[in-house]
């Protein structure tokens, strides 16, 4: 089995040096703006060029994160960012939005394109779809088991990258809106405030309004370092360390540990644990142990351990790691009046230097001493990998040790300088497409999403343009409704759910349904013959990504709920667009169950609540018990736009019902049909912000 790339975080220049000096094969870093860690130090275009030169000189690749959702007003700036990455000579772009992918392929097609974990790709068909879209690598969701990772690796035509150490988001990446709707800072836009680390308490017996105290949404850091050999065997091409917001010492400690395990050597487990943990680590997802032991918080004892471990970790990157093989060629000698030393690497770089001093006849064989002098490469990234000696007439002769040392230094300095030369990617001319704006002021048609058929009032079904139901409810939908019913596919499909979903679609092909709502790129591969609409999971926020999905056969799409009305107006891809007009927004989609902190699945009624520090209750629903199930955490206050429907610049307004009773559904639909104000507490979400 081949050793995977060790990919380390570089949140700033110091962390970059620590990652490289401790042995990372590649680093990932953010260009200022457009990356999922906007609060990291990040790099300007000039700093990026310097970083690439530094890394490439040492045989280290640079992956640049442009992995946030973008709005129409930002597309020109994003195109400039792609040009900056190409000019810097970086190796790859990590992209989330399909607009970013399109810009990379249009502007700098030789740049490698990696599908961010924010795309929520986690299945074999998802990897195949990214390959079809032009991606060179898929970065899998963190929630997968070893068996699921292996299945993707075996099926994937492109490289597979997995996270192996660092912070675990509670939500599936790309499917979290908690920070945006609770604090106005979108994780999908690189500004997550980490609200899941605050108290969200699943404990029973809390009095109404009593603040929650337990942090039941806070997962321990993941640690798959002990499992690296298994991941290598599974076919993983790159193992990624999370942590651009952490310290250089953290990066060095984890990189060093990964290198040791990949080489079959022991590593300092205590140092890895002490440099950062949240009451220890978890490998629950990888090993199929989805239980309460996955959760933990950062304690004062953890912080004290980090302070104590930091000096030791700092020693790991005090000096250059000698990793770049250098081959020497030596010629000339006494009769030639000097010697010529050539240094070359395996990448085709070659430099030559000449002795300033004239050699004198040697009393003994000088070659052993010459080899010792040329092998002293400490303090450089080079390691001697052979000497080809071709002495002239009279032999090499004698030169003092200082002269050989100076020759070596001069040769290696020149070779390092040559390796540091940046090779930009060719940039193609690209004119940003223009997109029409959506008309404002027209009344959108009404559609509604229901959790099940019993929740939908018969009289409302006749008045709504579309009815949307989970595909699991298909058989219970009355035939009279099917002509206007769209079957909603799952946003995530763990275990065997992808195969089951594809099989169910095949079985329902001729059952009279109006279409299917796709929520993951994977689903584009097994929905042939269906009229397709894009759902919440596609995260469409701009006209370029909307147009790309339309070109892939999507005939209408729900815009991402964080999108402000002004940004929505710019999304008019030539197919109908939709926006939520009512609903308790799904703030998180999780595989780990927060309720497992207080009870096991056998004692669970299929859901529960979480109490935050302000005394508010967040409903949690569960699709199935165990690791195959998905939990959804809902906002306690519903979004409502009933009396402002004309302000939604879309064709269809969608009311999303979850746990409401049929009677309550009827009341809310009446308010919407009559454009009436809401009858209880509500929110306008982020529609009127300038996000």
Language-model regions, residue ranges each:
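Glycine-rich, highly charged phosphate/nucleotide-binding loops
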Residues: 43-48
């Amino acid at each position: 089995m081949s050793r995977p790339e060790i990919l380390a975080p570089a949140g700033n220049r110091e962390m970059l040096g620590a990652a490289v000096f401790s042995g990372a094969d590649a680093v990932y870093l953010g260009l200022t703006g457009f990356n999922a860690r906007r609060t990291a130090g990040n790099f300007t275009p000039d700093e990026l060029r310097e970083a690439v030169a530094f890394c490439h000189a040492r045989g280290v690749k640079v992956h640049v994160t442009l992995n946030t959702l973008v709005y129409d007003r930002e597309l020109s700036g994003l195109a400039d960012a792609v040009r900056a990455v190409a000019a810097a000579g970086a190796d790859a772009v990590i992209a989330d939005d399909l607009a970013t992918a399109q810009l990379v392929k249009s502007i700098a097609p030789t740049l490698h394109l990696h599908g961010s974990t924010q795309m929520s790709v986690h299945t074999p068909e998802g990897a195949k779809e990214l390959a079809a879209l032009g991606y060179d690598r898929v970065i899998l969701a963190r929630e997968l088991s070893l068996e699921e990772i292996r299945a993707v690796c075996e099926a994937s035509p492109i490289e597979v990258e997995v996270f192996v150490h660092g912070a675990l988001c509670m939500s599936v990446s790309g499917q979290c809106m908690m920070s945006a709707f609770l604090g106005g800072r979108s994780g999908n836009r690189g500004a997550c405030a980490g609200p899941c680390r605050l108290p969200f308490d699943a404990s029973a017996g809390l009095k109404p309004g009593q603040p929650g105290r337990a942090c039941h949404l806070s997962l321990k850091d993941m640690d798959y370092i002990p499992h690296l050999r298994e991941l290598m065997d599974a076919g993983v091409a790159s193992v990624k360390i999370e942590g651009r917001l952490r310290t250089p010492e953290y990066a060095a400690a984890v990189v060093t540990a990964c290198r040791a395990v990949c080489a079959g050597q022991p590593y300092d487990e205590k140092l890895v644990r002490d440099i950062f943990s949240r009451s220890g680590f978890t490998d629950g997802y990888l090993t199929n142990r989805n239980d309460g032991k996955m959760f933990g918080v950062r304690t004062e004892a953890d912080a004290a351990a980090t302070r104590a471990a930091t000096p030791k970790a700092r020693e790991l990157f005090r000096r250059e790691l000698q990793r770049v093989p250098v081959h020497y060629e030596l010629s000339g000698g006494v009769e030639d009046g000097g010697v010529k030393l050539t240094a070359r690497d395996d990448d085709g770089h070659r430099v030559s230097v000449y002795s300033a001093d004239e050699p004198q006849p040697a009393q003994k064989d000088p070659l052993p001493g010459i080899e010792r002098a040329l092998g002293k490469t400490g303090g450089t990234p080079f390691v001697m990998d052979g000497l080809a000696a071709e002495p002239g007439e009279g032999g090499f002769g004698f030169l003092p040790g200082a002269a050989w040392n100076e020759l070596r230094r001069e040769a290696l300095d020149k070779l390092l300088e040559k390796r540091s030369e940046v090779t930009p990617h060719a940039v193609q001319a690209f004119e940003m497409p223009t997109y029409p704006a959506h008309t404002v002021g027209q009344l959108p048609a009404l559609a509604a999403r229901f959790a099940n058929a019993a929740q939908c009032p018969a009289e409302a079904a006749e008045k709504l343009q579309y009815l949307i139901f989970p595909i699991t409810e298909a058989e219970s939908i009355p035939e009279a409704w099917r002509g206007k019913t769209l079957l909603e596919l799952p946003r995530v499909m763990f275990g065997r759910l992808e195969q089951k979903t594809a099989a169910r679609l095949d079985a329902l092909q001729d059952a009279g349904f109006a279409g299917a709502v796709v929520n993951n790129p994977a689903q584009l591969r097994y929905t042939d013959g269906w009229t397709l609409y894009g759902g919440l999971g596609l995260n469409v926020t701009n006209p370029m990504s909307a147009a790309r999905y339309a070109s892939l056969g999507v005939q209408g799409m729900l815009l991402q709920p964080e999108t402000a009305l002004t940004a929505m107006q710019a999304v008019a891809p030539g197919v109908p667009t939709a926006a939520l007009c009512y609903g308790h927004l799904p703030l998180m989609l999780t595989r780990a169950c927060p309720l497992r902190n207080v009870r096991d699945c056998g004692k669970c009624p299929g859901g529960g609540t979480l109490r935050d520090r302000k005394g508010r209750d967040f409903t949690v629903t569960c699709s199935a018990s165990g690791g195959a199930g998905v939990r959804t955490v809902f906002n306690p206050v519903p979004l409502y736009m009933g009396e402002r429907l004309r302000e939604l610049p879309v064709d269809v307004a969608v009311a999303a019902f979850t746990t409401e009773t049929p009677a309550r559904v009827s009341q809310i639909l009446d308010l919407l049909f009559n454009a009436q104000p809401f009858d209880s507490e509500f929110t306008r979400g982020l529609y009127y912000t300038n996000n």
